[in-house]
């Protein structure tokens, strides 16, 4: 005869394994759902914080741009004014040298009474003491490197015997691009 076998520990072991299996089958999906939900919430809150930080940085950048914009515009305007003054000075220096060259062309007994600049034409009027000085002036004006003799105006002798002359000249170098 065989001794009696106690199946109680085996049954308890099987029952415990059975309960563990079904507990795992019911709890695992629940834990998985809770874990996924938690991860999604953490990811969402992290994205929300990142968006908030980016929005704040963008707003701060916009505020700083609004603050610095007038100063930058003022600096740009000052640079443009400085550049305009520099071009004007260069224009004046160019004219100064051209007018000094024109003055050097005048014979000893000739002087200018009026100089005017209108629409690209320099009009000079003056007096000479003799007709030879007037002819020398016209010859030197024709050979001038700065101006081109356009038109000779009226030439007449006044009551004191001086010769009045009038010439219209144009610059050989264009001034249009300077201003």
Swiss-Prot record:
Pfam family, one: PilN
Domain of life: Bacteria
Membrane protein topology class: Single-pass membrane protein
UniProt keyword 4Fe-4S present: no
Main location, first listed in the record: membrane
Disruption phenotype: Mutants are unable to use DNA as a sole carbon and energy source and show decreased competitive fitness when cocultured with wild-type cells.
Keywords: Cell inner membrane, Cell membrane, Membrane, Transmembrane, Transmembrane helix
Compartments it resides in: Cell inner membrane
Function: Required for the use of extracellular DNA as a nutrient.
Protein name: DNA utilization protein HofN
Species per Swiss-Prot/TrEMBL record: Escherichia coli (strain K12)
């Amino acid at each position: 005869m065989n001794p009696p076998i106690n199946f109680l520990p085996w049954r308890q072991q099987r029952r415990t394994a059975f309960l563990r299996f079904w507990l795992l089958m019911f709890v695992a999906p629940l834990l998985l759902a809770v874990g996924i939900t938690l991860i999604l919430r953490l990811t969402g809150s992290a994205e929300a914080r990142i968006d908030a930080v980016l929005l704040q940085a963008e707003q701060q950048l916009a505020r700083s741009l609004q603050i610095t914009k007038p100063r930058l515009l003022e600096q740009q305007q000052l640079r443009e004014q400085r550049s305009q003054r520099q071009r004007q000075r260069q224009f004046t220096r160019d004219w100064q040298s051209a007018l000094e060259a024109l003055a050097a062309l005048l014979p000893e007994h000739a002087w200018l009474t009026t100089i005017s600049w209108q629409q690209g034409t320099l009009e000079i009027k003056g007096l000479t003491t003799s007709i030879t000085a007037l002819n020398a002036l016209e010859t030197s004006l024709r050979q001038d490197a700065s101006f081109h003799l356009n038109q000779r105006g009226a030439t007449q002798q006044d009551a004191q015997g001086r010769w009045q002359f009038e010439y219209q000249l144009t610059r050989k170098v264009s001034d249009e691009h300077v201003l």
